[in-house]
Amino acid sequence: MSKNNISHTSVRHKLSLIGVIVTLGIVFGDIGTSPLYVMKAIVRAGDTVNAEYIIGAVSCIIWTLTLQTTVKYVLIALRADNKGEGGILALYALIRRHSKKWYYLLAIIGASTLIADGVITPSITVLSAIEGLRAYEPETPVVPIALCIVTVLFFIQQFGTNAIGKLFGPLMLIWFTLLGVLGTMNIGEYFPILQAFNPLYAVRLLASSPEWFLILGAVFLCTTGAEALYSDLGHCGINNIRTSWAFVKIMLILNYLGQGAWIISHVGNLTPGVNPFYAIMPHGILFFGITMATIAAIIASQALISGSFTIFSEAMNLKFWPRQKIKYPTDVKGQLYIPFVNISLYVLCVIVILFFQNSENMEAAYGLSITVTMLMTTLLLSAYLTIKRTHRWAVTLFLIAFVGLESIFFVANMAKFMHGGWVTMLLASVMIGIMYIWYNATTIRNAQIIVRDIRDSYSIISDIKADESIPKYATNIVYLSKLGGTYEIEQKILYSIINKHPMRADHYILLHIDYQDTPSTLEYDTVTLIPDTLYRINLRLGFRVHPLVNRYFRQIIEDMVVQKEFSLASAYPSLAKHKVMGNFVFVLINRLYAAYSYFSFRDRMIMNAYEWIDKLKLSITRSLGLDTSNVLIENVPLVVRSRTSNHANAIPRVERVENEEEENVK
């Protein structure tokens, strides 16, 4: 047996000034554009806007950023990394072998709601930025401009954003500095706003306000980007994120304080629709501020789109989502492009912009589903802490604190349901349904595999190879196997080799692709089962590694030739004389489902739905990067196995009866 790494990549995210600046452009776009609409939403949420109300609301923002973003995500969640990678699916992959089976539900609910809320992010950030132009021209066509920006943004994804991406960090540094400076300039309008650092003002406001749920729904918008912060752990590293967050948090709080002070000082003459963010800008830099807000909105949207590609790629490898075509527009590690996801997100963003028309209407839809994501992350984090043998009292305290806090935010955001929140929840529900069906259908299909011991067939496979009366199908036949055990083989593969039509070849290779719980694993091992005849290759891929099986397989064969474990020479003397190599044919066993009554009702429903969803997936030959001219697909029925050990009981046995006419003949 031999074991090798196909490639080895060591990525270290050392703390550095450049690393911190790059992190600003990758991680904090979403949370960094929240000042565009949070205070405006808070003003709209209150029946009576006065100093006490604004101080309490800003206090809610400060302590939400402290408890939810800083404590939960920056201090705790970032420690739960999967070989340096973060995000809810990476967290699930880290704990799934040690947790309860139903935990996959937490992962698919969390991932679905994260993507659903992400449809709103580009729309609301771009609209909020462009609406600032109405300070110059009240009749500015905001929606058409926003649609143009979103269209260009999604269009350029296919070419990669590596070139302009290098500017994101410095531009976001300018943006956050602008936030801090503008806030500091306006705090002087009402110095008592600094009382907002006292959490008692937040408690007092929520306890005395009948519309507390509306207030919290608006406040929650300040931390919607926290989940993205965790998801981008693998791009930047924990130290760079934590260091840059200290700067980002200070700038955000200064800006919220400045907006709060301005609102209090102008509380008597607030006009409907006024955005405090633009109101605190000196008129001379307003155009610059709008330009920077638009750039920040584009950067935030770009980060979300890239993050969506990553989430779907992980979901495919975790068997949550049908395999889709993946492209790599640049050589940058981890930068990928999924056409189906890109066009789907684009269409949904356009629909959202046309449906809501402005950022005020969109605020009602924003934030609801992300609270569900955060709740799911909390539950998975508690499982992680338990696995890491954290003190039980600490895990319990963590659960009580954050399930309690996020449940309050969820209840508060439910007030948005009828005002637009249903949009993201509907989208999330569709995605949850697809993921649930795909995962369970895959599990059902794998459960029907009949396993045989390959050693029992050594002699007949060797005899088929030597039997020259059987036409040779190929020099090398590669069977894709779902089983990873050294001597395990599917009955259907044996049937293909021996029974269906004897598949004579010089070499038979069983290739098993094993998706790992780690993100970047790329390695293989080989076993020679019958010398110069039968081989097994186990290819292990991390959940963030694209399965370019054709390329990896070629590398493996080249390694085996160098190690003298395999020969590429043709068995035909005339071809071997001219050094013509033998050909390879991949054989894929495609098991077709039929709605047998002996499936349980649940399984029948899942498999029937699976048949429809299956039409969305990329063909297995394209998803694995195989040369279609060298692929044979054999369709076989999906035979249902018994839930007991007795396979014969799975299908009702036909009872033999006596033929009455035959009796009369006798």
Q: How should these model regions be labeled?
A:
Residues 2-666:
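The structured alpha-helical core of multi-pass membrane proteins
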